[in-house]
UniProtKB/Swiss-Prot annotation:
This is Anaerobic glycerol-3-phosphate dehydrogenase subunit B. Pathway: Polyol metabolism; glycerol degradation via glycerol kinase pathway; glycerone phosphate from sn-glycerol 3-phosphate (anaerobic route): step 1/1. Conversion of glycerol 3-phosphate to dihydroxyacetone. Uses fumarate or nitrate as electron acceptor. The keyword Hydrolase does not apply.
Length: 419
């Protein structure tokens, strides 16, 4: 099977890369093993929240300039501030075209409210998510009886520290009792599958309506809206106060929705989606990828002109930690890591951890190296890259988006030259 590009990994980076390549008229396939990290995320995307020295970032342009000085090997630093902003804006356009109407500005970070009621600087958020400063003084944090993925009293306690009048309440929906037989089934995603049925909408409205008459804003867990935000908009039009949603413990409704929107758009535009499959071997000849072998296709290889590695970091097994060191399991690419295992981590848990910055070594075009030699038609994007800390620096989503589009543009340019 011949393709212009085969992408190994179906997370945020892989999907955005595929969508951008389709804009250039290239035929793409994505090989994906299972759920991506988006399923376990908040559904919001960070661009740059803090510098390596811990300084918080509000002005993105100034932050990127400072990042270039502090961390010259960071993926953003390789591109330069203006290029990062341009690619981030293009990524936002791609997301919106896929139906993910995310709110945000590449020039200025905003503060979203987290499930614990604290604030986190971010780039893009779903319109349902409350953004600081809140537009209300009287707030009610509403939980769902029996839902363990969201603790209303914890969120309320944090918000009260910001001089807000915050109460808590709990709604009980007997229609959800079918899920209560097994506590592990009473999760936000399973609740959403029931509540997204249009016949159930009035039941949720009836439960929230008495609470809404006594406050200016309701904050509740995101336990509906797996496919779209239609129910949220329907409720906001009818309730006498604003309704906002907070992501829950994983799996996340908002994260799953974002992934599904991107995946459906990729397939709609003619992309080949290979779910439940796994790349077992990649054949390289004369410094280029020639064949990709997958578990499901056995002796039928995929033959791409270009290949993209978007396999993620440790969470997605894109990187594997072993006693002797860190390795990239598909091709055995060169990995940036510390000299000894003792240097992988810091003693204090909440300090920035060195292992977060481990990843494959690439050139400035994000082409990785194998035994010191660049693989000419292979690109590495997203969390598998080295040189950044997605947690401490708050840049995970941004690095995925920016590196994906940079690789896609580079591939499209080279593909045009080869025709």
């Amino acid at each position: 099977m011949k393709f212009d590009t085969v992408i190994m990994g179906g997370g945020l980076a892989g999907l955005l890369c595929g969508l951008q390549l389709q804009q250039h008229g290239l035929r793409c396939a994505i090989v994906t093993r299972g759920q991506s990290a988006l399923h376990f995320s908040s559904g919001s995307l960070d661009l740059l929240s803090a510098l390596p020295d811990g300084q918080p970032v509000t002005d993105i342009t100034a932050g990127l300039d400072a990042l270039c000085r502090q961390a010259p090997e960071h993926p953003y630093s390789r591109l330069g501030a203006q290029k990062v902003l341009t690619l981030a804006q293009q990524a936002q356009t791609l997301l919106n075209a896929s139906g993910a109407q995310l709110y945000g500005d590449v020039q200025q970070a905003h503060q979203r409210v987290t499930p614990l009621g604290t604030l986190r600087s971010t780039w893009l958020s779903s319109p349902e998510v409350p953004v600081w400063p809140l537009s209300a003084q009287r707030i009610c944090v509403v939980g769902v009886s029996g839902l363990l993925d969201f603790q209303a009293h914890l969120a309320a306690a944090s918000l009260r520290q910001r001089d807000l009048n915050v109460e808590t309440a709990e709604i009980d929906l007997p229609e959800l009792d079918v899920l209560r037989d097994n506590p592990t089934e009473f999760r936000a995603v399973n609740i959403a599958r029931l509540l997204d049925n249009e016949e159930k909408w009035p039941l949720l409205y009836d439960a929230l309506s008495p609470i809404a008459t006594n406050c200016d804003m309701i904050i509740m867990p995101a336990c509906f809206g797996l496919a779209n935000d239609t129910l949220w908009r329907w409720l906001n039009e009818r309730l006498p106060c604003a309704l906002t949603l907070l992501p829950t413990l994983p799996p996340s409704v908002l994260g799953i929705r974002l992934h599904n929107q991107l995946q459906r758009q990729f397939v709609r535009q003619g992309g080949i989606w290979m779910p439940g499959d796994e790349v077992k071997k990649v054949t390289c000849r004369r410094g280029t990828v020639s064949e990709i072998w997958t578990r499901n296709h056995a002796d039928i290889p995929l033959r791409p002109r270009f290949a993209v590695l978007a396999s993620g970091s440790f969470f997605s097994s894109g990187l594997v930690a072993e006693r002797e060191g860190i390795r990239e399991p598909i091709l055995g690419l060169d990995v940036q890591q510390t000299a000894t295992r003792a240097e992988w981590y810091q003693q204090h848990f909440f300090d920035p951890q060195p292992w977060q910055q481990f990843g494959v070594v690439t050139d400035d075009a994000f082409r990785p190296s194998l035994a010191g030699n660049t693989v000419e038609n292979l690109y590495a994007i997203g969390s598998v890259l080295a040189g950044f800390d997605p947690i401490a620096e708050g840049c995970g989503g941004g690095v995925c988006a920016v590196s994906a589009l940079q690789a896609a543009h580079h591939i499209a340019e080279r593909a045009g030259e080869q025709q």
